[in-house]
Amino acid sequence: TGIRRSGKSYLLGTLFRKYLLENGTKPENIFSYAFDLASDIRYRNPLELVKAVRERVRTDGEQYYLFVDEIQMSDEVPNPYNKDGKKITFYDALNDLRSMPNLDIYVTGSNSKMLSADILTQFRGRSDEIRVHPLSFAEYYSAVGGDKYEAFDNYAFYGGMPLVLSRPTDKAKMNYLTTLFSEV
């Protein structure tokens, strides 16, 4: 969990994926669904997500990994088997998938709609929360290098949002931050 644009999706979908692949995980054993992408919109439905993952995970002794990005965009759907009005949620889907012994599940999200406390309550004793924060000065400096005092001045002014580092000019950095803060 963490604030928007703090690097959660990058850490999971790029760095952790790379780590898994470099350590022998087959690419086809890593399933990624990004609920903010139109191509994955159908998997916002918890029943569709469970169906898709269960079709891909084999009982062949191999380890599988599920990455779900932007979980706060998931849908609640009517329960077709129970007419009490209760909906099927992503909690139900993840609890179902969690029962698969050779599947590790990783979920990112950044919306107050799904508070980390609620998630930890739903999955008490069966999950770990990793909080992702903007870069510390040490992390920032390891990326920019150079004069430490100048780097600190820039860090104090622009902050530690990771994508600020990729903006080439002061104006581009300010535009990025202005847009980011207006979205929050």
Language-model regions: role of each:
Residues 134-184:
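Interdomain hinge/linker elements that couple catalytic modules in large macromolecular machines
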